[in-house]
């Protein structure tokens, strides 16, 4: 890289990082500004989502009352920005409103103490009380009742959907949830007039639920990354991903987008959903205005209405690689001035390396690209302190080979197993694997993580070879983050804490390297843990699987060194036992009679 080019790049990069592309005008009334920008419909939806994410146990009607009061106040401020209290910050206005809830102390306990604090400490306090695993009932589709409610009052029906999703996912990306609510509305608009509402709705709602869970997991990873690793780590993640998506965009352009995308997500993670949605709309506008220099895949997105446009941009496929990309070694391994460039502007130089490497490798996962950049940085730190730096860093690219081979080998091994046994048994293998790594973790969490990891096989193993690695490791990052988030609330394993907090890039290899926990004292065998009743026969298939998989995790906790064959025998016996008794006329009598025999034979098989 010629030095004059690097200087101009440094100027562009620094300018982009300090300014970004979003407007940052000051307004007399923040709430009036956001109300005018977003419009009443989106304003109300986002305030409802924000309040539901903070107070997850409050009834829907209570939240609607708060939202209506805030909306009326916003209208007053929009009409006269100098009206009383209109100059207060959104955190102050929303926090004051939340603190008026009469049942705050009784329902939320310590959260009520937040109301004694001043901003910004009060909002930070509210954030720490968000519950990633709230004790809320499972939502089940009831097509007839739901269609009646939808036709009677569509706005209330969609508001209830926003509320139910938001309180179960307290870090859900606010503006994206508005998009999913439109999908939800479209599903009911299509299916409610159908003769068989159930047959029409169920597949659509199941598919929407999967998209919701994925979207929630993606945003939770961003919010956790801000909290545990800081803004620099989030920006590095985004540089790698956007460089893969937009390989034709230059580094300064990618940097600008990363800066503002980071701002958008930081706002949403901090509960600032109105600013987040407003800034996201501005960023989508900027990207579409500059699409010619960013990506050839954006045109279809940019023709859509706002919510669909932003969603489409976020999900857009990687653009085609430019055909004239030069080899990287010349600039990053052979140039004699590398140490000078690195010392003069470390973040810019490393950012440039990450951008250049990532745009050439859509076949790598983001965390692999970050591990490569981390290795490159460590090599420069070492070599630039030596007598002959160029001789030292000349072979740096050779160090990347084992970093690439490790996840490729892991993906092949896991996909081979998935293709051999199918999703359910693949999940079982992962539940066993992770229970052995961290037997102290609660059984419901281990089963949830094992099932999620198992679904990665279905999602990724059928893809072409070039897409398997990024698909697998990017989705593994989401599942492992869920484990880390749940473990952070109730930490039980120092090894898990270390993997979760040491390094975002190294998190997956850290978990992969965990072995059987030799210091774990096995759980005592309790017959009631493996006692089942006739109600299992009428459960939906996924709930039946969870019951069996919970028993499997408990078996491993009882016998961590049980062999694969032993566990397979016991699980096979258990499945046969359930099938046998569910086929009997007097199911409960069968469970009562055969259950103790199963427990005894299981103990014997594991002895």
Curated annotation (Swiss-Prot):
UniProt entry keywords in alphabetical sequence: Allergen, Calcium, Cleavage on pair of basic residues, Copper, Disulfide bond, Lipid-binding, Metal-binding, Methylation, Phosphoprotein, Repeat, Secreted, Signal, Zinc
Positions of the pro-segment in this chain: 19-24
An example Gene Ontology molecular-function term: enterobactin binding
Post-translational modification: Phosphorylated by FAM20C in the extracellular medium.
Modified-residue entries (N6-succinyllysine), positions: 587
Domain Albumin per the UniProt entry, residue ranges: 19-209, 210-402, 403-600
Keyword Glycosyltransferase: no
Residue positions where Phosphothreonine is found in the record: 107, 443, 445, 569
Binding sites annotated in the UniProt record for Ca(2+) 1: 30, 267, 272, 275
GO biological process: cellular response to calcium ion starvation; cellular response to starvation; negative regulation of mitochondrial depolarization
Compartment annotation: Secreted
Modification Phosphoserine occurs at: 29, 82, 89, 442, 512
Binding site for Zn(2+): 91, 270, 272
Chain sites annotated for binding Cu cation: 27
Signal peptide: 1-18
Cysteines paired by S-S bonds: 77-86, 99-115, 114-125, 147-192, 191-200, 223-269, 268-276, 288-302, 301-312, 339-384, 383-392, 415-461, 460-471, 484-500, 499-510, 537-582, 581-590
InterPro entries, per the entry: ALB/AFP/VDB, Serum_albumin-like, Serum_albumin/AFP/Afamin, Serum_albumin_CS, Serum_albumin_N
GO cellular component, one term: extracellular space
Pfam family, one: Serum_albumin
Tissue/organ expression: Plasma.
Coarse class of the protein's main subcellular location: secreted
Binding, Ca(2+) 2: 37, 278, 282
PANTHER family tied to this protein: ALBUMIN, SERUM ALBUMIN-RELATED
Role noted for this protein: Binds water, Ca(2+), Na(+), K(+), fatty acids, hormones, bilirubin and drugs. Its main function is the regulation of the colloidal osmotic pressure of blood. Major zinc transporter in plasma, typically binds about 80% of all plasma zinc. Major calcium and magnesium transporter in plasma, binds approximately 45% of circulating calcium and magnesium in plasma. Potentially has more than two calcium-binding sites and might additionally bind calcium in a non-specific manner.
Record note on quaternary structure: Interacts with FCGRT; this interaction regulates ALB homeostasis. Interacts with TASOR. In plasma, occurs in a covalently-linked complex with chromophore-bound alpha-1-microglobulin; this interaction does not prevent fatty acid binding to ALB.
Protein name as annotated: Albumin
Origin organism lineage: Eukaryota, Metazoa, Chordata, Craniata, Vertebrata
